A protein has these predicted regions:
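Metal-dependent nuclease catalytic regions and adjoining charged, substrate-binding loops involved
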Residues: 155, 159-165, 170-255
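Helix-hairpin-helix
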Residues: 258-273
């Protein structure tokens, strides 16, 4: 999450994932952006670069899908925004009716809070993604309307996870605001098992809006004194939430400190917290 100005905060899909499961993540991010004394100095010790084998494998998976679609559809039917104005170019490509858009850009602002993200694939309403002979392609259904786009995200995982659906729902909602959402379509995930899974809008958007409301409420009703360092929890509510936490090392460190206090002082965690 980024504070651009007093009147604009920007969040992405991972911020929404965190907000859906852990108050600690959202509050710590807001405190960091508010420059609460002590917060930046603490979290910078636990910043983790976005790298490693899972990221490398994920990028290769996406690159393979990109190459397969380009080979299948050709350069005119499979496009990627190339300039600096990704959002404007993405909208232009959709208005031009390009069948498949790779790594486009979508935004949606409510009050002082703006979502900014990049769906892996935006597919025109009259096309279906499909694996043919093990390779990804898009097949046109000429009986369907070509108006609007369907959001797809690629995930290396072999099965859908709840926070993946929040991402897709954000893209669906942003398309709707632009008036470029395919009506009645099922949006979905391209999984590492080379299978597709789809969802109706009503299955995924309500949960996204609930998670988003936590971010909106926190920013729209923001009072700086509520984010004083001493009021912040320094670990996720559960170890499972650390899978999407910005500072998992801080969580582990803080839990270790609390366990040490319990052992030394003979008190329970509820007394510490």
């Amino acid at each position: 999450m980024r504070k651009v100005s007093d009147d604009l905060w920007v969040y992405n899909t991972r911020d929404l994932m965190r907000a859906s499961s852990c108050d600690h993540c959202t509050r710590l991010a807001i405190a960091r952006e508010l420059r609460i004394p002590g917060v930046a100095e603490l979290v910078e010790k636990f910043e983790v670069p976005v790298a490693g084998l899972p990221i490398d494998y994920g990028m290769k998976f996406e690159a393979d899908l990109e190459a397969e679609l380009l080979e299948s559809l050709g350069a005119e039917a499979f496009r990627k925004p190339e300039g600096s104005g990704y959002l404007a170019e993405t909208i232009a490509l959709m208005n031009d009716g390009v069948p498949v858009i790779y790594q486009g850009s979508l935004e949606h602002q409510i009050g002082r809070v703006k979502f900014s993200g990049r769906p892996d694939f935006l597919v025109r309403a009259d096309y279906d993604l499909a694996f043919v002979d093990g390779k990804l392609t898009a097949i046109q259904d000429i009986e369907r309307s070509s108006v609007g786009y369907i959001a797809w995200d690629a995930k290396l995982a072999g099965s859908p996870k709840p926070h993946y659906l929040l991402q897709v729902a954000l893209y669906v909602d942003a398309l709707a605001v632009l008036g470029l959402k395919a009506e009645g379509a099922r949006h979905g995930l391209i999984l590492g098992s080379r299978t597709l899974t789809t969802f109706e809008e009503g299955e995924i958007v309500p949960a996204m809006r609930q998670a988003r409301s936590y971010i909106l409420d926190a920013i729209e009703n923001l009072e700086v004194e509520q984010f004083a360092f001493d009021s912040l929890s320094l670990h996720c509510d559960s170890a499972d939430s650390c899978k999407v936490c910005e500072y998992p090392g801080l969580c582990a460190h803080n839990r270790l400190e609390l366990d040490h206090l319990v052992q030394v002082a003979g008190i329970n965690k509820s007394q510490i917290e």
